[in-house]
Amino acid sequence: MLEKEIEKKFKKALEAKGCLVYKFASPNCRGVPDRIVITDTGKVLFVELKTEKGVLSKLQRTQLKKLRDFRQQAFVLYGLPEVEEFVNNIDDWR
């Protein structure tokens, strides 16, 4: 499955659970996670989506570390099974 298709399913499933899901595009700061998820309780989660065989770039690893250093919840999900698990467990982050 293509990353674009994974992103579409991710967004649709989380919106069905009452979350806001935004595409994170920062032209001046490359390597940021694909999506920002905001739960109905105000929790903010950063998510990088990859195919099952996807690989993080060095820049993506650096950006994820920066977010985590600032005590932000940042995730990397590989493929549809991990997306489904994340969505099924979103209540843990509310």
Regions found by a protein language model. Give the residues of each.
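Catalytic phosphate/metal-binding cores of nucleic-acid and nucleotide-processing enzymes, i.e., regions
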Residues: 1-94
